[in-house]
């Protein structure tokens, strides 16, 4: 692997880890340790960003009307996850999204790709909408835009509402295509 790309990969991994990690802007004067790598090394319009999935970062697993997902069920079975960890709190982005976005902005990211928790919008996977879940994502998107960052949204990251798994057998059911369409159209 070319050394410049290895450094970029290390920067992206370090910056995505949070935890107070600070990285110099890749275009900063005197950043010779980057081997000349800077934003100018990429095509005009290249978007620098970071990405997460709802279950891995949001936390607030049973807060404000969110229903359980298949990941909640799986992670709460002792021994399924190392150290019996789960996403109940995670990094608590649900309550700390402004801090997270501010950190992304301070690292000079242009965009943030995140997934929406289907069970935060539709606690039962279908039917009644959870207005508090909708408000959370509206607030996150609006704050990203306010900070000049582009939101990229992933509608599904392997966190099917548990109610749909139990009622229809999950993705093995042909009914899921219609249910996902309803969710996406919302």
Residue spans for each PLM region:
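N-terminal signal peptide
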Residues: 2, 11-36
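N-terminal amphipathic alpha-helix/helix-capping segment at the start of soluble metabolic enzymes
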Residues: 6, 37-44
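Catalytic cores of glycan-processing enzymes that make or break glycosidic bonds
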Residues: 2-3, 18, 23, 78-82, ...
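Transmembrane beta-strand segments of Gram-negative outer membrane beta-barrel proteins
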Residues: 46-48
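Plant-biased, solvent-exposed loop and capping regions
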Residues: 27, 39-40, 127
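Aromatic- and Gly/Pro-rich amphipathic surface segment
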Residues: 68-103, 107
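Short, solvent-exposed beta-strand-terminating loops
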Residues: 51-73
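Substrate-binding cleft and catalytic face of glycoside hydrolase catalytic domains
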Residues: 59-62, 97-186
